[in-house]
């Protein structure tokens, strides 16, 4: 009985230290997670600073050519600034209202798209070579995770992420 009381005090103290640490360091972060077999795995975490660059590279599933999407984090959400691609096709921007279109270095480029996206949800696919570059670091997700793996990229506080991990759901 005495041992259980000591153990509970230790658990309480450790929990209190963790929660205090999270409150003190509760800076907004960008999380990249991969869901495998119902378990969320953290792939990367970076400080959610304004103008943080994010690049998504993949092979278009229909055209079988490279696509590069360039985004930046504005402090609250992601802004799709530019899309570069090698061939026109389904799902690729082409209308005047999509932005400013031009050709450069063998790529079709749609600049000044300025589309806001709060959270990104991607999937690894057969032959798509899904890769992201976040704050200068490259993650070849297609090499790390099986085909069909859900990849989420979103801003959240460390404290909120801690409680999601404990409770098991977003609130």
Predicted regions mapped to residue ranges:
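N-terminal secretory signal peptides
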Residues: 36-84
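Mature, soluble, non-transmembrane domains
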Residues: 94, 98-171
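A short, sequence-level motif marking secondary-structure junctions
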Residues: 47-50, 74, 86, 125-127, ...
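Positively charged n-region of N-terminal signal peptides that target proteins for export
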Residues: 1-11
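An acidic-aromatic
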Residues: 68-110
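Short, surface-exposed beta-strand-loop junctions and turns on beta-sheet-rich folds
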Residues: 62, 86-88, 116-117
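Hydrophobic membrane-insertion alpha-helices, especially the h-region
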Residues: 11-26
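Short N-terminal edge-element motif at the start of the domain
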Residues: 24-38
